[in-house]
Amino acid sequence: MNLHEYQAKALFAEYGLPVSEGFACDTPQEAVEAAGRIGGDMWVVKCQVHAGGRGKAGGVKVTGSKDEIRAFAEHWLGKNLVTYQTDEKGQPVAKILVESCTDIANELYLGAVVDRSTRRVVFMASTEGGVEIETVAEETPELIHKAIIDPLTGPQPYQARDLGFKLGLNPTQMKQFTKVFMGLAKMFEDHDFALLEINPLVITDEGNIHCLDGKIGIDGNALFRQEKIRDMHDPSQDDAREAHAAKFELNYVALDGNVGCMVNGAGLAMGTMDIVNLHGGKPANFLDVGGGATKERVAEAFKIILSDDNVKAVLVNIFGGIVRCDMIAEGIIGAVKEVGVTVPVVVRLEGTNADLGRDVLASSDLDIIAATSLTDAAEQVVKAAEGK
């Protein structure tokens, strides 16, 4: 689950971190009134969506005119913002953040993630603020400095000072940076974050550290104990198919290919996507139906996959462990009949009663291709998607 910028900054403020005064607004009139409450003669207005690249897409504006604030809000509220991080439809804009304008002397980067290789929370800092951290990691990795948080001792001030020295901060800024670092580390643990980014973390003209942006991702598995964070969820930013899949306990992630994938088990699903890619295809989705591949769940999975108009063929890859393959085959046949699948369907079954399952598929009067191996399945579905 992701948070909007205004929600992230509200959390920053709760932990005593320096953020701009701002208000999230639902209407153009509210946006104009917010500028009046903030005061001054320059403001920043930002579309609130769960995507980066807003500035390049016209979703951020610096202005000294309340009329321009009104026009910006009238233009964007209720519309979709398309950036390089969204699909072609973009993300709906329901709120506009109006903030005081900050004069910037220098831009830095500060972020934290759960690093699986070290099994620790790792903070990253860089002098290359305002740039995608992935770009920095690829082109100039030596400019990314890290601090690994030991879960037994927690974050330590010396780690913040070490990062601060590498960022070239002066003693006053070092103290401010240490406060930000310690506050973010506590916030990360308190609220079960999976990702945290401040890009850019700026040094103002007065020489002070300031959190100019905020990006937060929450571990969805921890939401049961994060009621406050859970209430911040904005369903309008979710992919409609992913949200529908979650209702049926299906793990679905939309992609941009033309081969629909239905698999039981996350590891097998990722392996299936890899082998489809290996044979020249492009997966249209990740979909894990879990351990209970029942007719009902398979039917819903087909409906979700086929709601994507780009899907030209479907690969069903099931390992029968607890559930027998012949029962799974009957479920697939029933689901195909119920949904009215019109694209080619390739099925690969392995495990308990796999041969019997393939016989069940072969004896049906449906156009279902029973593959003999995973390689065969990938080759068949890629050909089918290409119309061969």
Swiss-Prot record:
EC nos: 6.2.1.5
Give the coiled coil ranges: none
Which EC class is this protein assigned?
ligase
Asked if the record carries the keyword Nucleotide-binding, the reply is yes
Record: residues binding Mg(2+): N199, D213
Keyword annotations of the record: ATP-binding, Ligase, Magnesium, Metal-binding, Nucleotide-binding, Tricarboxylic acid cycle
Its pathway is: Carbohydrate metabolism; tricarboxylic acid cycle; succinate from succinyl-CoA (ligase route): step 1/1
Known catalytic reactions: succinate + ATP + CoA = succinyl-CoA + ADP + phosphate; GTP + succinate + CoA = succinyl-CoA + GDP + phosphate
- All copies of domain ATP-grasp, residue ranges: 9-244
What residues does ATP bind to?
A: K46, G53, R54, G55, E99, T102, E107
Gene Ontology annotations of biological process type: succinyl-CoA metabolic process; tricarboxylic acid cycle
Q: Which GO terms describe its molecular function?
A: ATP binding; magnesium ion binding; succinate-CoA ligase (ADP-forming) activity; succinate-CoA ligase (GDP-forming) activity
Q: Which cofactor does it need?
A: Mg(2+)
Q: Where does substrate bind?
A: N264, G321, I322, V323
Which function does this protein serve?
Answer: Succinyl-CoA synthetase functions in the citric acid cycle (TCA), coupling the hydrolysis of succinyl-CoA to the synthesis of either ATP or GTP and thus represents the only step of substrate-level phosphorylation in the TCA. The beta subunit provides nucleotide specificity of the enzyme and binds the substrate succinate, while the binding sites for coenzyme A and phosphate are found in the alpha subunit.
Task: Return the similarity comment.
Answer: Belongs to the succinate/malate CoA ligase beta subunit family.
Designated name of the protein: Succinate--CoA ligase [ADP-forming] subunit beta
State the species of origin: Shewanella sediminis (strain HAW-EB3)
What is the primary gene name for this protein?
A: sucC
